[in-house]
Amino acid sequence: ALSYLTAPLAVFFAGYLRAPLAVAGLAVLAFAWWYAVCKTPQVKQVGQEEQGITLSVPKLVLLFALMLLWGYLGGQTGFFYQNSDWGYRNAIYRDLITNSWPVYYPQKDTALVYYIGHWLVPAALTKPVYALFGLDAAWMFARMALWGWTALGTYLVALNLLVYLRADTGKKQGIGLLFLIFFSGMDILGALYS
């Protein structure tokens, strides 16, 4: 999970900063990641058992498939319903793929200023596809990359939630996942109703 959170920052440093700052930022980020993963002692209170749950491989695969379905139904691929604001976000994502970084619009003398972290890894993976095969192929790949990246993130959130809840039975795991999924916006119901 820490690597998932660190990756967009690493891509930002590499793609948006000048070389000396990028190298320094990446070095600090790599050290912080290494320290957090390898050197930070696990903090436990006296008498507290170590938290952990066991999930079989089929359950892990099913959970990832559920996260893929959730992302698909949420509009990640563009093949299913998307709220009206997806048009703006798709344009920003496309600009991250088709323009050099940092994204600058000379006709308006302005830069792309937005919270772009979630798109940076899929956009970086898509840039070579755009360079080799053009926009149509790149956009298809980009939608799949964003879908996979989002599914991975929600998968890690779901796993961490299940550990936090100590969901050690199928019933507890199901309730935890229902809570996670239905805690979010339910705007699709409005779209289906209209």
Predicted regions and their residues:
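Alpha-helical transmembrane segments
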Residues: 1-8, 59-70
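Hydrophobic alpha-helical membrane-interfacial segments at the cytosolic entry of transmembrane helices
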Residues: 58-66, 174-181
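Membrane-embedded, hydrophobic transmembrane alpha-helices
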Residues: 1-53, 153-156, 165-166, 172, ...
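Short, mixed-charge, low-aromatic patches
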Residues: 46-54, 76-83
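Membrane-interface helix-boundary signature
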Residues: 52, 56-59, 139-142
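Long, contiguous, compositionally biased segments that the model treats as domain-scale units
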Residues: 56-59, 72, 76
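Active-site lumenal/periplasmic loops and adjacent helix-entry segments of GT-C-fold
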Residues: 73-194
